[in-house]
Amino acid sequence: MHKLVAGVAGFVLAVLMLAGCAGDDGTTGVTVEAKEMRFTPKSATLGAGRQVVTVHNAGHLRHTFSINSLGEEVTVNPGQTKTLAVELAPGTYRYVCRVLDHEGLGMRGTLHVN
């Protein structure tokens, strides 16, 4: 009986978490972690339309999250989390950290939009 209750509770929790992925206005998004000289994930796939990118700086240095082709950028200090709402057409978008040579040291990634 306890296994059944635990299984049902786990299923309900999973459904609630998935329901929380879309905003009231139809937005969806991705969370990117910035840490010394890397972004995680290095790439993500999203649907076209309004997307929210949440950037969390888990490192000890200041970073930026820049989508140059859209002219969008946020600066994220250590321990901070910031969001960036963008309208994405199908295509590929590169994101980078523009602090010093962080991009050259590996802080870059790609958003694939279907």
Please place each PLM-identified region on the residue numbering:
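N-terminal edge beta-strand
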Residues: G26-A48
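Extracellular/periplasmic metallocenter environments
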Residues: V15, D24, V76-N114
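N-terminal post-signal-peptidase region of extra-cytosolic proteins
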Residues: F39-K42, S69-E72, N77-T83
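C-terminal region of N-terminal signal peptides and the immediate post-cleavage residues
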Residues: L16-V30
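Histidine- and aromatic-enriched segments that form or immediately flank copper-ligand environments
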Residues: L61-T75, G104, T110
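Soluble periplasmic/extracytoplasmic beta-strand elements of cell-envelope proteins
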Residues: T31-E33, V52-T54, S66, V96, ...
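Sec-dependent bacterial lipoprotein signal peptides
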Residues: M1-G20
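Beta-strand cores of secreted/periplasmic/IMS beta-sandwich domains, seen most often
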Residues: K42-L61, K82-V96
